[in-house]
């Protein structure tokens, strides 16, 4: 049986926030539309990939390349979810694959998200992508630009990334590409 599909129509609010301290943060995309509120929980890499895809779509559809500041002395965190955003949204799930589309006629972007399903086999818990997207929302170009700005600020406030392997640098950082050493996998 497939999960219900949640078509949120046009977003009134679409943004991202990080909850917790760097190294132990959770990221979410929060959406509010006339059809309800949604919290889509994502990994940092998913958020960065979505930001890059949105920026690419915006650049390709405007004919103008938008440059983003990569470094700021003291980046300010985005405001996060508004105070009146429900603590128990209508839709909430951990996101697996996402799809990004663009409606040329209305000049809007479309985000579709598929949840991860937790499956237990032989006493082990596994995450598996669902077969079909179960969430969609349209958002404007200006909302897309604001979303990318928020994601950029969030990632700048987190742990720095290794320029060689892209992994988070905190404490002892083992980088196979930098020094040829990778700690043994003891699991």
Task: Please name every model-derived segment.
Residues 1-187:
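Positively charged, low-complexity terminal tracts
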């Amino acid at each position: 049986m497939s999960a219900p599909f949640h078509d949120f129509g046009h977003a009134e609010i679409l943004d991202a926030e990080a909850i917790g301290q760097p190294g132990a943060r959770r990221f979410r995309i929060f959406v509010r539309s006339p059809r309800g509120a949604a919290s889509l929980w994502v990994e940092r890499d998913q958020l960065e990939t979505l930001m890059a895809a949105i920026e690419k779509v915006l650049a390709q559809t405007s004919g103008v390349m938008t440059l983003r500041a990569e470094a700021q002395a003291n980046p300010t965190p985005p405001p996060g979810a508004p105070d009146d955003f429900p603590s128990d949204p209508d839709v909430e799930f951990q996101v697996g694959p996402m799809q990004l589309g663009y409606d040329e006629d209305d000049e809007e972007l479309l985000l579709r998200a598929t949840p991860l399903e937790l499956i237990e086999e032989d006493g082990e818990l596994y995450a598996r992508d669902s077969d079909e997207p179960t969430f969609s929302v349209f958002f404007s170009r200006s909302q897309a630009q604001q979303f990318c700005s928020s994601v950029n600020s969030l990632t700048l406030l987190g742990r720095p990334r290794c320029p060689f392997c892209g992994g988070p640098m905190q404490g002892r950082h083992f980088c196979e590409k930098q020094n040829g050493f990778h700690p043994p996998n003891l699991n």
